[in-house]
Amino acid sequence: MRKFWVALSSIEEIDSSFIQRLFNYFGDIESVFNASDLSGIEGLSVKKAENFLRLRDRVDVDKVYQAVVDRGINFLTFDDGNYPLMLRNIDDPPSVIYYKGNLSDCNFDRTLAVVGSRRATSYAREALSQIISELNGTDICIVSGLASGIDTTAHVSALDNNLKTIGVIASGFDYTYPAANKELYKRIEDGSGAVLTEYYPTFQPIKFRFPQRNRIVSGLSYGTLVAEASLKSGALITANLTLEQGRELMCIPGLITN
């Protein structure tokens, strides 16, 4: 059954919400992959149904599944009992979570998302580092997006203080973005935490995927800490998602001179 989830997630032209819609209708993922008639799905146009069937029938299930295995990538599917409950309960949960590292080491009852500017000020970085250092000795897991700036500070501070950390990336594992964080990826994967993504390994870090991944950052977490953000930033997108998901939202006060 797991390979059918992977096969569907390998189709770039569809997203998790569409896969979930089909899964909810048919009741199991193998039926989704083998279905020939989608006419009973309310609101699904004939054109979209035909396009999906055409794309699906091109997929070599065993080949795309084996490509994940050969890369040493672990994964959880939406119907897996180990799929994080907090993430399952959001409006648009990822159909598959691909990951490297030790996801099972993370306490999903003690998760804190950290978001902020890629061009963070020294004040924001220092304030965040101090806050995270005071969590040393707890089992809190820091969740962020492995971008430059605040994300990097959050992950490094977590690791330096013996905390678990999860990096949620906006591409498949064939890509490292930003390239400057290659060693940080490895440090997380080899240490106390995991790097994860909803994207099949070959999917590139395209611009629209960055705001998409933000729902996972907040969705994995009981609360979100905004360290620093501009008015139209991805950090504020995550902040809004946090409120929509009914989670706690916190922020580091800015300098009164800023």
Regions found by a protein language model. Give the residues of each.
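Short, positively charged patches
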Residues: 1-134
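Glycine-biased, small-residue-rich flexible motifs in mid-sequence functional cores and linkers
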Residues: 78-258
